[in-house]
Amino acid sequence: MSSTKTIGIIGGGQLGQMMAISAIYMGHKVITLDPAADCPSSRVSEVIVAPYDDVDALRQLADSCDVLTYEFENVDADGLDAVIKDGLLPQGTDLLRISQNRIFEKDFLSNKAKVTVAPYKVVTSSLDLEDIDLSKKYVLKTATGGYDGHGQKVITSTDDLEEANALANSAECVLEEFVNFDLEISVIVSGNGKDVTVFPVQENIHRNNILSKTIVPARISDSLAEKAKAMAVKIAEQLNLSGTLCVEMFATADDIIVNEIAPRPHNSGHYSIEACDFSQFDTHILGVLGAPLPTIHLHAPAVMLNVLGQHVEAAERYVTENPSDHLHMYGKLEAKHNRKMGHVTLFSDEPDNVVEFGKGIDF
């Protein structure tokens, strides 16, 4: 019997494209569902062109594939439930629903996985903001939607309450106490439904709420790094994880606080393609297929730089001058401002000397 599988990927952006490349290297066939015929995955896989919530298209994908996965969390979970058969979607839809709603996510992290999160409260209207202690700093986030800083309002004084009240009256929200952290970090973990494997802790630098630079390993103590990895594994085991999960965290001087989870490979893990013996995309494919998972080894300290639309020319010049560094371009046709167009990975044990592309250009 052939071990070749047909893998259906919901979403044809850069994450779906890199999942597909890993699957193809392993000898599998890939079919992608995406609304755009010219999506990045169209360069490496067959594409069913349809909206993500098109139940007929989801059924066509399901009927054509041995296993399904998704590249992002904004997938119609109800639509998936309507078409999937037992075992067809190893990640399941429970994880989707948890990651789609910050209220569900906070409840899962604090009460089921029992990891440390920032103090928070559920906000259903502006009335829930009337008694907050303005000697503290807060972040108000909509329960659903929002990415790269959208759907959020920082509250530091009464001057911020008008916008915060409007946000609270527009949608269910979560109010989090602001964490005075030293570093933003993340941990990639992959599971196959039984076992898990974990990647090195990554240090992340954001500009305008968009990831700009990832440094591996993160510059934190060994004890904090082990604590961060243990938290990620605990979350993965609570989920009986299949595939790859990213746990985003804050590192303080003496603690790790979990911020949120992404039920898929993550921008901060792209360095793993060159810097580890297996990438986060490799372990994702192995995980959803229920295959044995490798132990992850980092070849050498590495840095990943995001290439946004306004950075493309600078990135192309950079790799011309530094041909040993690795440029990945995703094949997006239009280089819009702040649109993720690619990334560069390089080996360096002096990460402060690696200049982000946005410096001197535009973040």
Q: Which role fits each region the language model picked out?
A:
Residues 91-153:
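A conserved helix-loop-beta module that forms one wall/lid of the active-site cleft
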Residues 24, 84, 110, 134, ...:
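Anion (oxyanion) recognition and catalysis
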Residues 47-52, 121-125, 155-156:
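Short acidic-hydrophobic, aromatic-tinged amphipathic segments that line or gate anion-handling sites
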Residues 167-220, 226-258, 262-270, 278, ...:
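Phosphate-binding core of ATP-grasp and ATP-grasp-like enzymes
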Residues 3, 286-363:
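Peripheral (often C-terminal) accessory segments that flank ATP-dependent C-N-forming ligase machineries
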Residues 60-61, 132, 167:
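Structural alpha-helical scaffold elements that stabilize or flank donor/cofactor-binding regions
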